Each structure stands twice: as C-alpha cells, then as structure tokens.
C-alpha cells in the first residue's frame, strides 16, 4: 500500500484481488460443487489456480505466505516480536468471521500465552495485515458515536487459500469459509 506514497502524483493505485468464485469457475474444468470445494480450499490466486495437484497448490500458497507476505510485513514494518505477530495471524486464521477487537485479542494473549502484548500493538499488527491486503475488516453499520472505537469487527482473508496455508490446511470450517467467500464476492 505504501507504494502509492513512493510515487505520489505519478499514477493511480490499482488493487488486484484474487479471482472471485465466478471468475474461478470460468477457468475451472469440473462441476460447480467440486469447484466450490477447490476454491474454498486453495482460493483464487491465479498463480495457484493454474497449478496442478493438491501438493503443488499447497506448497505454492505456503511459500507465498511465508516468503512474501510474512517476510515483507515484518521487514517493511520493522516488527521486533515476530512470534506475537504470527500468533495473531494464527488466531485470525482460525476464527475468520468472528467478532473481535484489539482489546479482546489482548486478553486472549494474556490468558493463553501469558503475553504482555498491548491492544495498541495488536491494532498496529492488524493495520499491517490490512495494508498488505492479506485481510480486510468488516465494520458494523448499526453503531453510533463513541461505540465505533472498540466495537468488534469481523476479519476476513482476501484469499482463503492463504488463510488455509497459514493453518497448514488443517482446520476447515465450511460455514466460516463460506462466509469469507461471500464477503469477498460482495466486496467486489
């Protein structure tokens, strides 16, 4: 996202999303039910969609996540405690579509990990993930006034394949994954 500041006034920022489900199905050679399963597992990143075989797709996604997203986020933002950042990613990956906020996440860290991470640090990390287009937050629209400040949001991955790669393809919850797919379809 910062590239726009590097080249201020020299062009327009264009954000390319992964393939939508409809776009994915236009290149998928199979029935729509198998296509939906494949899309919910491996996502719509063209580099991955064009690969053959489950192992090759999984390896490409895991490499993309760790070597591109994670490394760039940590390097660009000078993250000192990479373990906490990764733990936050794991929490978000295993709870897509759940209402949460930095304060709740801080309490989770304190209870489960005996960590002293602050809600401000978590807020920064969430911003890093959003700036890298890894996740997006969905704000509630029925809130007014001061309640906006700490109202829980839902976090969705821009690509379910990246989410699944993060948790090593081990936690497949069809309802939450479908909610993420629907969010991504509506976002476009």
Predicted regions and their residues:
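Conserved catalytic cores of phosphodiester-cleaving nucleases, focusing on short active-site segments
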Residues: 1, 17, 182, 186
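Short regulatory helix/loop adjacent to the ATP-binding pocket of P-loop NTPases
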Residues: 1-13, 26-32
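Acidic/polar active-site rim loop that often engages polyanionic ligands
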Residues: 5-9, 18-19, 41-44, 65-69
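Gly/Ser/Thr-rich beta-alpha loop segments that engage phosphate groups in nucleotides
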Residues: 11, 45-46, 91, 99
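Hydrophobic/aromatic beta-strand patches that form the interior of the parallel beta-sheet core
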Residues: 12-15, 156
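Conserved AAA+ ATPase small/helical "lid" subdomain
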Residues: 33-66
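Accessory nucleic acid-recognition modules appended to NTPase machines
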Residues: 53-188
């Amino acid at each position: 996202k910062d590239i726009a500041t590097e080249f201020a006034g020299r062009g327009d920022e264009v954000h390319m999303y992964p393939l939508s489900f409809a776009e994915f199905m236009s290149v998928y050679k199979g029935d729509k039910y198998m296509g939906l399963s494949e899309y919910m597992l491996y996502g719509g990143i063209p580099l991955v969609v064009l690969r053959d075989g489950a192992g090759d797709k999984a390896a490409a996604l895991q490499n993309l996540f760790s070597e591109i997203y994670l490394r760039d986020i940590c390097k660009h933002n000078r993250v000192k405690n990479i373990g906490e950042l990764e733990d936050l990613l794991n929490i978000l990956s295993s709870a897509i579509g759940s209402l949460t906020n930095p304060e709740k996440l801080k309490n989770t860290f304190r209870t489960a990990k005996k960590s002293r991470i602050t809600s401000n640090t978590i807020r920064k990390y969430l911003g890093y993930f959003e700036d890298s287009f890894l996740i997006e937050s969905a704000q509630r629209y029925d809130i007014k006034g001061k309640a906006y400040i700490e109202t829980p949001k839902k976090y969705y991955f821009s690509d379910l394949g990246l989410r699944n790669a993060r948790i090593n393809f081990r936690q497949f919850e069809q309802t939450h994954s479908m909610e993420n797919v629907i969010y991504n379809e509506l976002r476009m």
